[in-house]
UniProtKB/Swiss-Prot annotation:
The keyword Magnesium does not apply. One of its GO terms (molecular function) is peptide-methionine (R)-S-oxide reductase activity. The gene is msrB. This is Peptide methionine sulfoxide reductase MsrB. Its EC number is 1.8.4.12.
Length: 142
């Protein structure tokens, strides 16, 4: 289940995000391909929204797409993201945004592997990563 909505003013977002995160997450920017640290990440764990911390993707669904951005064939739960039509730059794409805070994550395409056939192409700067061990420690504190 998605967590309670996070609402902040743009000034508040600017205070808590780096300039690059703000550009991508709040202004729908795109990082350069192959530039993000999570593109190369092979550890087991969970990818969370860099703005609000909501869990979005599992390392179990990450795959090598060759595009230069972290790619996943599925989300942890369909209520974690919202899909929006994006016709910017004279293209027809589907934008992926965090359902909790509305931040831009990337786009989803219909050219991914089985079992979904989807490729969630996500900006590395839009994500944080928690290893399986960090996730277990968080559960123990609850």
């Amino acid at each position: 289940m998605a967590q309670k909505a996070v609402e902040k003013s743009e000034e508040e977002w600017k205070k808590v995000l780096t300039p690059e995160q703000y550009h991508v997450l709040r202004q729908k920017g795109t990082e350069r391909p192959f530039s993000g640290n999570l593109y190369y990440n092979k550890e087991k764990g969970v990818y969370t929204c860099a703005a609000c911390g909501q869990e979005l993707f599992s390392s179990d669904t990450k795959f090598e797409s060759g595009t230069g951005w972290p790619s996943f064939y599925d989300v942890i739960s369909s209520d974690r993201v919202r899909l929006k039509e994006d016709t910017s730059y004279f293209m027809n794409r589907i934008e992926v945004v965090c359902s909790r805070c509305g931040s831009h994550l990337g786009h989803v395409f219909e050219d991914g592997p089985a079992p979904t056939g989807k490729r969630y192409c996500i900006n590395s700067v839009s994500l944080n990563f928690k290893t399986e061990e960090e996730g277990k420690q968080g559960e123990e504190r609850m």
